[in-house]
């Protein structure tokens, strides 16, 4: 699976997501592609384009989603995406506790990516230290 930035952010040479996606699928029709999205609208667009997987990777990390957190209101953004897309949804971005992992799977995510919680142990250590200050 290759993940692509599916946000509305600008791309090199001003290329649009639709064009980039179709170029890849034309050249590599069997390649599985995941859309890294930051908003519901981006997820819906990626789903319509035909991405094999829709990811919540960029929620909270872009200008258009800076006020969002994936776990707000019992994962409201994830629940909305799950209810509106036909392709499998991969929960990614700030899935940093076993409880969050369990919840996104209960909600129907195809799978989840636990990134920084594993690859950057200093962040988890800091969260534990801050909790007891």
List each language-model region with its residue ranges.
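Short intrinsically disordered, low-complexity coil segments enriched in acidic
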Residues: 1-8, 31
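Conserved long hydrophobic alpha-helices within structured protein cores
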Residues: 2, 46-57
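Conserved beta-strand positions in the central sheet of alpha/beta enzyme cores
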Residues: 2-3, 34, 55, 113
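Short secondary-structure boundary segments
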Residues: 6, 37, 58-59, 93-94, ...
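Active-site-adjacent beta->alpha loops and helix N-cap segments on the catalytic face
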Residues: 6-27, 40-45, 62-82, 98-102, ...
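Short beta-strand/loop segments at the ligand-binding rim of alpha/beta enzyme cores
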Residues: 25-35, 82-92
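Catalytic cores of alpha/beta
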Residues: 38-50, 85-86, 91, 95-112
């Amino acid at each position: 699976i290759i993940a692509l930035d599916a946000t509305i952010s600008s791309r090199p040479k001003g290329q649009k997501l639709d064009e980039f996606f179709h170029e890849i699928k034309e050249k590599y029709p069997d390649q599985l592609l995941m859309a890294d999205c930051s908003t519901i609208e981006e997820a819906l667009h990626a789903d319509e384009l035909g991405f094999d997987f829709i990811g919540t990777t960029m929620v909270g990390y872009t200008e258009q989603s800076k006020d969002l957190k994936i776990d707000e209101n019992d994962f409201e953004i994830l629940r909305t995406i799950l209810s509106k897309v036909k392709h499998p949804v991969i929960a990614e971005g700030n899935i940093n506790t076993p409880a969050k992992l369990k919840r996104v799977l209960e909600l129907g995510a195809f799978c989840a990516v636990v990134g920084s919680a594993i690859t950057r142990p200093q962040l988890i250590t800091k969260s534990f230290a801050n909790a007891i200050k």
